[in-house]
UniProtKB/Swiss-Prot annotation:
Keywords: ATP-binding, Helicase, Hydrolase, Nucleotide-binding. A motif (DEIH box) lies at residues 336-339. Belongs to the DEAD box helicase family. GO terms for molecular function: ATP binding; catalytic activity, acting on DNA; helicase activity; hydrolase activity; nucleic acid binding. It comes from Methanocaldococcus jannaschii (strain ATCC 43067 / DSM 2661 / JAL-1 / JCM 10045 / NBRC 100440) (Methanococcus jannaschii). This is Probable ATP-dependent helicase MJ1401.
Amino acid sequence: MLIVRKPKKKKDEIEIVKVGGKIEDGIEVKNNQKIFANYKKVGDKYKLYRCRVGDKLIQPSKVLELLKSDKIFILKENEEEIEEVLKSYNLKFDYIELCPFCLLKNIYKRLTRNNRCRYGNLEICINCGINEIKEEVKISEEFIEKFLKRFKDVDKVLSLLRIRNPLDKPELTRYDIITGSEEDKIENYKIDELDIPEELKEIIKSRGIEELLPVQTLSVKAGLLNGDDLLIISATSSGKTLIGELAGIKNLIKTGKKFLFLVPLVALANQKYLEFKERYEKLGFKVSLRVGLGRIGKKVDVETSLDADIIVGTYEGIDYLIRTKRLKDIGTVVIDEIHSLNLEERGARLDGLIGRLRFLFKEAQKIYLSATIGNPKELAKQLNAKLVLYNGRPVPLERHIIFCKNDFAKLNIIKEIVKREWQNISKFGYRGQCLIFTYSRKRAEYLAKALKSKGIKAEFYHGGMEYIKRRKVEDDFANQKIQCVVTTAALSAGVDFPASTVILESLAMGADWLNPAEFQQMCGRAGRKGMHEIGKVYLLVEIGKKYHAKMENTEDEVAFKLLNAVPEDVKVEYNEDEEEEQILATISAGITNRYDIDRVPYIGRAFSLNKILSNLESYGMIKANNDVKLTNYGSAVAISFLYPKVAEKIKEGIIENKEIIKLITEIMPFENVYLSNNLKIKLSKILNINVPSRFFDALEVIREGMEKIKDKKLKEDLTLIIMEFEGVEVEEKILEMIINLRISGKTPGQISKTLYEEFKIQTYSGDIYYYLEQLLNLLDATERIARIFNKRYAEKVKELKEKIENPK
């Protein structure tokens, strides 16, 4: 290939370059590889003369030979004279577009449809566009490239990064729109056409539902109403719950056998319990809830009877009934959020639960509900279920990305989005409401408070709240009394607020970035069929932001990875601790024959049964013959949901008469303890280092830096803190403080306040609430084991447990 062009500022000269290789990637050409030739008009034609390579002159005839030897390309614009020169020698040519910025660096790069962008009046390559933006904005190259490939315009990208109020330019912030698929065009079944009892039809129609949604229709076609086991995969909020209800209530009416509905989180179980109670008690069915109800705070009156027709529960709540052999007469099992199989630790427990349900209730219909995953066929085969795969969305989803300079800017954008959404009333008569996800409970509380101070009706919602408070927030949102709810990323699977808009204030969950499954779940919460015409998602991204030092990527880099991520495969593989727990749980459920234990259809088993049984026998939890017998110790461990090796640690502490606080700290330390932010900032300046946020780490830094602290009051305060923890295990001491404050009658909020006021220790009421709930479960387990090995120890544990649960 030959490229012929006019060099800049040379009126009567052409440049000829021979290019080999992939010119779309850019080829560097040195000056000594270029041929220059002058031209002049003689009569009505042009002639070449004074030709050279560098400083060396060559004959015009040699240049003509070269021009005739290969295909010639010239630039499209302002090259009329070159065209005339080539025509004078009867030379044929085509046109080519080169990046003008690359040419300035002696790089010849062809512009194609995919590698170009606009900059002012010029067309340049994506790489040069990236460099121009990097000159003005500090941002990752990958991030810029994604935007340039989308907008094809440097100025537009710069506008997006600099815009004062991005909400005024939705065409700039909009990343994409996810709409329906071919499946959305199918003819949906009318409710009256379904093979279900008339009373169920009336209940459904009373909710304003006259016909099924696409995924529901596909499920009916796949055998939902014929008792077939199904794995149903579709986006969040696409109508999966009703699928379970159709099968469960139909089977209940026809056979009288129980309908089980399993969910991963207490918050979601509470919501489903109240919904089913309202809907189906009018048919004469009893609905009960099986979850670990909160024991800290006000007690809640809910139905928990096992004689109920419909039982809603968390995975652990239902598994407890199986491990204690108290679950009978099951007709339908619906397991929601089955993609939770991917979760560390919890995935193994869910897999074990599913295996036991499949083995014990072979005749029951199993419906597995999942968000989008990467290996649906494989999972359906493993579950021995028919696959129903729906890729559409009942409501289109707009995804926007907005750049924010700092947390303050994020807060202002959130306020503006919430206000605009609230003013927007859908054709169905609903105001727009927002669901805001952030990385921690503390942050959720802070944002809700900050938004309230700006006149927004906002509430926080997280797992550390008492049931009654959570329920009030749910009701207020459903009744459109509040404009937005701020919740944690960790609760994304358990939040079912009918929001028009989802705002991701952060792309982190705790100390880690969101994974694609979590991100997709959050996005799926935006837009509800019959309430909103469209759902919106806003990613608020701070360029270069990391929430923890261990994070490898920055928030801007993570944003594009999440937006472009493909669904993750669901994979389950037990480690030894997990397999020991699941085999012990199976034996506890009454499956005691070796052959039967081996036939329980787990997905994740990785060890031989003989090895696991041998381990359990060595702990004294079973007696392994052909028919395996569970010991009292094994039973206590199984119903306590403990790893057997952890139970061994507890047993050892009980036998040694170890102090209860010491034993608890070894098994389950309270780790969410921080130095107050004001003190951290002050000390970091004085000591000229970044003082750690975690209290345990910061205390050591304070001890070593005391000599540098000259402020008398500060030194006195720090000395008191150091003396309080001198010569003791800090974790034990803090746990002892928390327990003593609780026993004295303080609420989690009051405990947090006392620790701050007296020791500048920052804790959060939600974390303390959650920890005390988990602590009571651990004390239950410890008491069970102690009843076998040390009854006096058991009494001490029982006494402590009662004091924590029912303080003065």
